[in-house]
Amino acid sequence: MKAVVSKLYCSSMEEVMVVRRRPHVVNGGGFVVTDYKEKIVFKIDGCGVLGTKGELVLRDSDGNDLLLIHKKGGVVQALSIHNKWKGYSYDYQGSPKPVFTLRDPKHSCFSITSSIRISVGPGNCYFDVKGYFPDRDCSIVDSKGNVIAQVKEWIGSRDIYKVVTKPSVDKAFVFGVIAVLDYIYGESTSC
């Protein structure tokens, strides 16, 4: 898989990452991602920290912004059968660069599909979310049907779960998608 955000976050081997939700009361919500050595890899902040509804930021372990993700609004969006989220990274000059678009079907009688689809770049590169995120039982699958990442339940805890990423998968992209799923389902990044 080609890097979506940065090749710095691609690994040559499968990795298991641990996600810990932060309480809204103490840290404004969001979550922290650690590796198997319990070293922080990513931090995700939502509106509890940012103060803006429908906006998320994925940061690296040093606090540098990697992805700005926001929910599209406006009249056209209100008439659409999908909620649309856009993820932006920053180029070397600090300008935002579009990275992905996630389409989440609105709950209505007009919705034909319940699949969450992520489009990356120009062309036909897309991913689907299969399964149900709130149950910690879902996968991100590429257009060929290959699982690139899996969200799995951590036994005994609702606030901790694990994410398994396959080799050469951009983990920053994966956790950008997971941040949106967290928000969509009203969890730690939502208001």
From Swiss-Prot:
Domain of life per record: Eukaryota
Disulfide bond sites: none
One Pfam family hit: LOR
Record field: transmembrane: none
Family: Belongs to the LOR family.
Functional summary from the UniProt entry: Might be related to the phospholipid scramblase and tubby-like superfamily of membrane tethered transcription factors.
Full protein name: Protein LURP-one-related 6
